[in-house]
From Swiss-Prot:
The gene is Znf532. Residues 26-92, 106-206, 220-265, 281-362, 847-877, 966-1000 are annotated as: Disordered. PANTHER family: ZINC FINGER PROTEIN 532, ZINC FINGER PROTEIN 532-RELATED. The keyword Nucleus applies. This is Zinc finger protein 532. It comes from Mus musculus (Mouse). It comes from the Eukaryota. Belongs to the krueppel C2H2-type zinc-finger protein family. Keywords: Acetylation, DNA-binding, Isopeptide bond, Metal-binding, Nucleus, Phosphoprotein, Repeat, Transcription, Transcription regulation, Ubl conjugation, Zinc, Zinc-finger. Residues 253-265, 336-353 have a biased composition (Low complexity). The keyword NAD does not apply. A zinc finger (C2H2-type) spans 615-634, 751-775, 784-807, 814-840, 938-961, 999-1021. GO terms for cellular component: nucleus. The modification Phosphoserine is found at S130, S133, S134, S306, S313, S433, S875.
């Protein structure tokens, strides 16, 4: 039955709806936890708009009772004494929204608009928050709470009455009536004698002691305003015929909360409590009229108006359904609704000061006369029929090992906070009130959070403290400073803000076993949803197994959590934090030694050239005059730094800070910031800090680990005892002296270098010059050295190019004595020999006689080597000149067009049309005319092909036959008298043409003014003509 379906239920239905349920289905609670929490946020926001009171996001007071049922709300909550408000409040903190709802309902009841049942339906839904566990302060899945043992309910009940209303709740009031028999005739309630006056007295003492906690926090000004408001509200309610101490007190709380701001929530709550305690006597006097007026209140009006409240608080229906279901089996479980559902929203709860809900059974009977009789029966702890476990086994599932979180500011606040005594008093009060109860009823929620006295924490570092629970059980808790929580989420940071209220948060895993502090902590159970029976049994096993098994059970319990509800917050342990701090200290530490600046002005006679600022270390700023000193600087051993570079994916070992930073600089130059892990710092023994140099010679010290990489091949001179090590040009070196034991063997008459004519001042300088020069010029000699400089090349073509570019073509030239043009020269003797063989028909020319010996700087051996080289690898120019052989034998296969004009008598002419071949040119010219279809067509005299235009024929001759211009063609019979002379170039014609022939197009016979215009014109004929032009120009 939903709230929308409620028509006019009987009064018994409403009373039964608010019976205390024994158990809430954990699955249902898990499914609806998120939505319920969102609906709470919306309700809180609605209350804020009406009453201008901040929602429950602010940090509440440090000690407020947990699981307070809405005993101080108006008559609907107390109708049957069974409050589902265990659901309503979490960890003993009454939410601001709940107080606001009191204020709203109180105001409405003054006006007579809203019946008391509206408060009955609204308060359970609104009371599911605590001032500390607001939706804004913590995220939905990151809550911490402790379900306190049910043994402390007696003290909690009395404490609730003072904190919230200043008067005893109706349920306790019924107990008092049953014990004292004072008001039983007025209320008509039959009582059961399961409590005695000692318990009542103890409750009263607990109330008074607990209220004394807040004495130092009283605010006088707020107290006076609260007193005035309470008096006005009491008077108005008495006039309306509804005098209710619960209404007046809730109105006072609402008035207090409506006048406060988020920053003053704590002080306003304390002031409200103080004012309510001052009104205790007036509230007690109003109890009996409240009960009588509630019984006499008309039912239909309450029921008709109640759906309005139900619309505002959809959570109430879930509570009613759960309570009705639980009322069918009132003796099943001593657990209350809040013990399961309170895990939804509360991040913290006081262990030492807040007892649990009493296990009672209230039986409501409506007599025929219309009177209501209720019987309150104390239910002893029994085995839970739903889960089959005792209350001590009802602990929720284990969270993954959660260490205590303390922010640094919170630690300072804890150390300097004055109210130590009130917190200790609160803990003592809880312990005394539950002294007679069995310690088996202690239940621990998934993430237990205890509010410890300030004296429990003395330092901000990691330590183990003893925590005494309310059942006289002492456990060890590990407190770790906030330095290890640098990567925590915003929820953890907000939790640390809540800690600043003079409390210390200790998770339940630390309570279970203080030695389990893993490196990486996954706060898997911060969702605080009711857990299943499997996880509950695992916690029970954890508490009884050895430490090794505890760790495994914790991992299994964490794995059983719903994956979508797990908050993946990784907390860096203190060990990792110390490593990171050490690494940062190494990288950011200031060098205590001042920056070293060398003397960069050597004597003038030393002949040493130094950089402007020396060889400077980019990491520490030290500068050195010698590059060897800089290499030794990077090789020094001061500390062993072993680190894993994530970019290089390898373990690296550095022996000083500069080498590590230099490696990081290499990554930075590539645009990547160096990331490293597994840092290990080890001191270097004093005997290993200085690496002894080698015992060879003074110069051999240059063979250091860094400098050796740039050194060339060592050269050993046979007459010297030690090896002379050639160093880089930038590194000054001392020569190996003396050069010879006997000075008479030294063929030196002055301090002048015979190679470069440089004069030196002393023998060491000259020796250094020679050794240094040998180092620079001691490169590997290639096959073709240049005689003009110290370079060498692997091929003769590279050498020729080098001579042509660097030495302006200074080279021995060969001129042909048979050619009339003296400008025809050759750069190689082989080319001259081939020229004479091809052009002049001399088989064995004497090149030595023909060569120009003027300025000859080469020898015959080089020329012979070049001839052999050229014979193996012919040059591109030689390839073009080879087909011009005059006495070359004819080709065996004449199946392709002739690519070059062959000037020989053995030429075979082939008809391209029919394939006729002959060596007689006249016979060939007599054959080809028969293939000419038209007398006006242009026929090629070389192959017999016909073309329609002279340009096409000229193009064919130029490309295929390499002829510069077409031959005269006979139109009649194709045979001319001078047909044999056409293939021979005329020397007279070539001379006549002169310079104009160079600018004439060989394809279309056009003449151009410049060579550039001709080259541009050749592009119109295509690449084939351009290549032909280049080849023809190369032949010259």
């Amino acid at each position: 039955m939903t709230m929308g379906d409620m028509k006019t239920p009987d009064f018994d239905d409403l009373l039964a709806a608010f019976d205390i349920p024994d158990m809430v289905d954990p699955k249902a609670a898990i499914e609806s936890g998120h939505d319920d929490h969102e609906s709470h946020i919306k309700q809180n926001a609605h209350v804020d708009d009406d009453s201008h009171t901040p929602s429950s996001s602010d940090v509440g007071v440090s000690v407020i009772v947990k699981n307070v049922r809405n005993i101080d709300s108006s008559e609907g909550v107390e109708k049957d004494g069974h409050n589902p408000t265990g659901n309503g409040l979490h960890n003993g903190f009454l939410t601001a929204s709940s107080l606001d709802s009191y204020g709203k309902d109180g105001a409405k009841s003054l006006k007579g608009d809203t019946p008391a049942s509206e408060v009955t339906l609204k308060d359970p839904a609104f009371s599911q928050f605590s001032p500390i566990s607001s939706a804004e302060e913590f995220e939905d899945d990151e809550k911490i709470e402790v379900d306190d043992p049910p043994d402390k309910e007696e003290a909690r009940a009395g404490f609730r009455s003072n904190v919230l209303t200043g008067s005893a709740p109706q349920q306790d009031f019924d107990k008092l009536k049953a014990l004292g028999g004072e008001n039983s005739s007025k209320t008509g309630v039959s009582t059961s004698g399961h409590t005695d006056k000692n318990k009542v007295k103890r409750e009263a003492e607990s109330n008074s002691i607990t209220l004394s906690v807040y004495e130092p926090f009283k605010v006088r000004k707020a107290e006076d305003k609260l007193k005035e408001n309470s008096e006005k509200m009491l008077e108005s309610r008495v006039l309306d015929g509804k005098p209710s101490s619960e209404k007046s007190d809730s109105g006072i709380a609402a008035a207090a909360s409506s006048k406060t701001k988020p920053s003053s929530k704590l002080s306003s709550c304390i002031a409200a409590i103080a004012a309510l305690s001052a009104k205790k006597a007036a509230s007690d006097s109003c109890k009996e009229p409240v009960a009588n007026s509630r019984e006499a209140s008309p039912l239909p009006k309450e029921v008709n108006d109640s759906p309005k409240a139900a619309d505002k608080s959809p959570e109430s229906q879930n509570l009613i359904d759960g309570t009705k279901k639980a009322s069918l089996k009132p003796s099943d479980s001593p657990r209350s609704v809040s013990s399961e559902n309170s895990s939804k929203g509360s991040p913290s709860s006081p262990v030492g000061s807040t007892p649990a809900i009493p296990k009672v059974r209230i039986k409501t009977i409506k007599t025929s006369s219309g009177e209501i009789k209720r019987t309150v029966t104390r239910v002893l702890p029994e085995v839970d029929l739903d889960s089959g476990k005792k209350p001590s086994e009802q602990a929720a599932s284990v969270m993954a090992s959660v260490t205590s979180l303390l922010s640094s500011s919170a630690s300072a606040t804890v150390l300097s906070s004055p109210p130590r005594a009130p917190l200790q008093t609160a803990m003592v009060t809880s312990a005394v009130s539950s002294a007679e109860l069995t310690p088996k009823q202690v239940t621990i929620k998934p993430v237990a959070t205890a509010f410890l006295p300030v004296s429990a924490v003395k330092t901000a570092g990691s330590q183990v403290i003893n925590l005494k629970l309310a059942n006289n059980t002492t456990v060890k808790a590990t407190v770790i400073s906030a330095a290890s929580v640098q990567s925590a989420s915003s929820a953890i940071i907000k939790a640390a803000n809540a800690i600043q209220q003079q409390t210390v948060v200790v998770p339940a895993s630390s309570l279970a076993n203080a030695k389990l502090v893993p490196k990486t902590v996954h706060l898997a159970n911060l969702n605080l949803l009711p857990q299943g029976a499997q996880a509950t049994s695992e916690l029970r096993q954890v508490l009884t197994k050895p430490q090794q098994q505890i760790k495994q059970a914790i991992i299994n319990a964490a794995a059983s959590q719903p994956p979508k509800k797990v908050s993946r917050v990784q907390v860096v342990s203190s060990l990792q934090s110390s490593v990171v701090e050490a690494f940062n200290k190494v990288l950011s530490s200031v060098n205590p030694v001042p920056v070293y600046t060398p003397n960069l002005s050597p004597p003038a006679n030393a002949g040493i050239t130094l950089p402007m600022r020396g060889y400077k270390c980019l990491e520490c700023g030290d500068a050195f005059a010698l590059e060897k000193s800089l290499s030794q600087h990077y090789d020094r051993r001061s500390v062993r730094i072993e680190v894993t570079c994530n970019h290089c994916t390898k373990n690296l070992v550095f022996y000083n800070k500069c080498s590590l930073l230099s490696h990081a600089r290499g990554h930075k130059e590539k645009g990547v910031v160096m990331q490293c892990s597994h840092l290990i710092l080890k001191p270097v023994p004093a005997d290993q800090m200085i690496v002894p140099p080698s015992s060879n010679t003074a110069a051999s010290t240059l063979q250091s680990s860094v400098g050796a990489a740039t050194h060339t091949v060592p050269k050993v001179q046979p007459g010297i005892a030690g090896a002379v090590i050639s160093a880089p040009a930038s590194t000054p070196m001392s020569p190996a002296m003396p050069l010879d034991e006997d000075p008479s063997k030294l063929c030196r008459h002055s301090l002048k270098c015979l190679e470069c004519n440089e004069v030196f001042q002393d023998e060491p300088s000259l020796a250094t010059h020679f050794q240094h020069a040998a180092d620079t010029s001691g490169q590997q000699m290639k096959k073709h050295p240049c005689r003009q400089c110290d370079k060498s090349f692997s091929s003769s073509h590279s050498l020729c190019r080098h001579n042509r570019i660097k030495h302006k073509g200074i080279r021995k030239v060969y001129a042909c004595s048979h050619c009339p043009d003296s400008r025809r020269t050759f750069t190689k003797r082989l080319m001259l020999e081939r020229h004479i063989q091809l052009m002049h028909g001399i088989k064995d020319p004497d090149v030595k006689e023909l060569s120009d010996d003027a300025g000859d700087v080469t020898n015959d051996e080089e020329e012979e080597a070049e001839i052999k080289e050229d014979a193996k690898v012919p040059s591109p120019k030689r390839k073009l000149e080879e087909p011009v052989l005059e006495f070359r034998p004819p080709r065996g296969a004449i199946t392709q067009p002739l690519k070059k004009l062959k000037i020989n008598v053995f030429k075979v002419h082939k008809c391209a049309v029919c394939g006729f071949t002959t060596e007689n040119l006249l016979q060939f010219h007599e054959h080809i005319p028969q293939h000419r279809s038209d007398g006006s067509s242009h026929q090629c005299r070389e192959c017999g092909l016909c073309y329609t235009s002279h340009g096409s024929l000229a193009r064919h001759l130029f490309i295929v036959h390499k002829l510069k211009e077409p031959q005269p063609v006979s139109k009649q019979n194709g045979a001319g008298e001078d047909s044999q002379q056409e293939n021979k170039p005329s020397p007279e014609d070539e001379a006549a043409e002169g310079a104009a022939s160079d600018r004439k197009c060989k394809v279309c016979a056009k003449t151009f003014e410049t060579e550039a215009a001709l080259n541009t014109h050749m592009r119109t004929h295509g690449m084939a003509f351009i290549k032909s032009k280049r080849m023809s120009s190369a032949e010259k």
